[in-house]
Amino acid sequence: MACGLVASNLNLKPGECLRVRGEVAADAKSFSLNLGKDDNNLCLHFNPRFNAHGDINTIVCNSKDGGAWGAEQRETAFPFQPGSVAEVCISFNQTDLTIKLPDGYEFKFPNRLNLEAINYLSAGGDFKIKCVAFE
């Protein structure tokens, strides 16, 4: 998946929220948001799949520790629409990350790396970022 935005030295602390808003491509197959320490140490790989890798309208989440992927977690809540604007809010603490989807639905993903700060963000695929905010 081609990488678009990459940001480092974010110093996002527990309890703070990262809000990402962007445009989903009209012909979207999938996109991803990655958060963590760096590209090889991700506490969250957030990957909405419209029709990719055998998944249809499914959000796949994972982590990467030292370059090794963990076990995938799938969410069937899928409020994303091709050709629309979408916003995702992500916050975290020592035990898990909370992902709030555009329709208000929230789910949790374990903080497997036990990160105390998130310093890295990357985005790729069929999603054009318009705004990144820290709250």
Curated annotation (Swiss-Prot):
One of its Pfam families is Gal-bind_lectin
From the Swiss-Prot or TrEMBL record, what is one GO molecular function term?
Answer: laminin binding
Q: Which residues bind a beta-D-galactoside?
A: H45, F46, N47, P48, R49, H53, N62, W69, G70, A71, E72
Cross-referenced Gene3D superfamilies: 2.60.120.200
In the record, N6-acetyllysine modifications are located at K13, K29, K108, K128
Instruction: Give the sites modified to N-acetylalanine.
Output: A2
Give a yes or no for keyword Acetylation in this entry.
Answer: yes
What organism does the record attribute this protein to? Ovis aries
- The gene name on file is LGALS1
User: Domain of life, per the record?
Assistant: Eukaryota
Q: Which GO terms describe its biological process?
A: apoptotic process
Q: What is the annotated quaternary arrangement, including any partners? A: Homodimer. Binds LGALS3BP. Interacts with CD2, CD3, CD4, CD6, CD7, CD43, ALCAM and CD45. Interacts with laminin (via poly-N-acetyllactosamine). Interacts with SUSD2. Interacts with cargo receptor TMED10; the interaction mediates the translocation from the cytoplasm into the ERGIC (endoplasmic reticulum-Golgi intermediate compartment) and thereby secretion.
Q: Work out whether the entry's keyword set contains ATP-binding.
A: no
The N6-succinyllysine modification is found at K108
Q: What is its main location?
A: secreted
* Cell location: Secreted, Extracellular space, Extracellular matrix; Cytoplasm; Secreted
Q: Name one GO cellular component term.
A: cytoplasm
Give the protein's recorded name: Galectin-1
Phosphoserine modification sites are: S30
Cite the Galectin domain residue spans from the record. Answer: 4-135
Role, per record: Lectin that binds beta-galactoside and a wide array of complex carbohydrates. Plays a role in regulating apoptosis, cell proliferation and cell differentiation. Inhibits CD45 protein phosphatase activity and therefore the dephosphorylation of Lyn kinase. Strong inducer of T-cell apoptosis.
